[in-house]
Amino acid sequence: MRLKPLGDRVVVKVIQAEEVTKGGVILPGTAKEKPQQGEVVAVGTGQYIDGKKVELEVKVGDRVIFSKYAGTEVKLDGEEYLLLRESDILAIIE
């Protein structure tokens, strides 16, 4: 991984939505929902709040759900990533 996020930013590898429904219907690209899940592949160093350094809650390897239109899309080595602020992450999937 050549992306090293700064501050409270997180790099997430996007997990693509299913292309076939449970009923066997193949969805065209225009009908698919924008992905909202991914795996954390890199985290920033944290942020300073009131002069104290606060570490990020998420860590590399966590599966997360994030806001639908959050972050900046980045393509690197044929893979699709999102660069998000930690506050754009809604939940960690356990």
From Swiss-Prot:
Record localization: Cytoplasm
**Gene3D superfamilies from the UniProt entry:** GroES chaperonin
Keyword annotations from UniProtKB, A to Z: Chaperone, Cytoplasm
Chief location of this protein?
A: cytoplasm
Q: Which GO terms describe its molecular function?
A: ATP binding; metal ion binding; protein folding chaperone; protein-folding chaperone binding; unfolded protein binding
Per its UniProt entry, which superkingdom is the organism in?
Answer: Bacteria
Please state the span of the N-terminal signal peptide per the UniProt entry.
Answer: none
Which SUPFAM superfamilies does the entry mention?
GroES-like
What Pfam families does the record tag this protein with?
Cpn10 (PF00166)
Spell out the GO cellular component terms annotated for this protein, sorted alphabetically and separated by semicolons: cytoplasm
Any keyword Chaperone? yes
Task: List, alphabetically, the SMART domains matched.
Answer: Cpn10
InterPro entries, per the entry: Chaperonin_GroES, Chaperonin_GroES_sf, Chaprnonin_Cpn10_CS, GroES-like_sf
Question: What biological processes does GO assign it?
Answer: chaperone cofactor-dependent protein refolding
Keyword Transcription regulation (UniProt):
no
- NCBIfam families cross-referenced by the UniProt entry: PRK00364.1-2 (NF001527), PRK00364.2-2 (NF001531), PRK00364.2-4 (NF001533), PRK00364.2-5 (NF001534)
Subunit and partners: Heptamer of 7 subunits arranged in a ring. Interacts with the chaperonin GroEL.
- Known function: Together with the chaperonin GroEL, plays an essential role in assisting protein folding. The GroEL-GroES system forms a nano-cage that allows encapsulation of the non-native substrate proteins and provides a physical environment optimized to promote and accelerate protein folding. GroES binds to the apical surface of the GroEL ring, thereby capping the opening of the GroEL channel.
Give the family this protein belongs to, as stated in its UniProt record. Answer: Belongs to the GroES chaperonin family.
List the protein's name: Co-chaperonin GroES
- Tell me which species this is from: Thermoanaerobacter pseudethanolicus (strain ATCC 33223 / 39E) (Clostridium thermohydrosulfuricum)
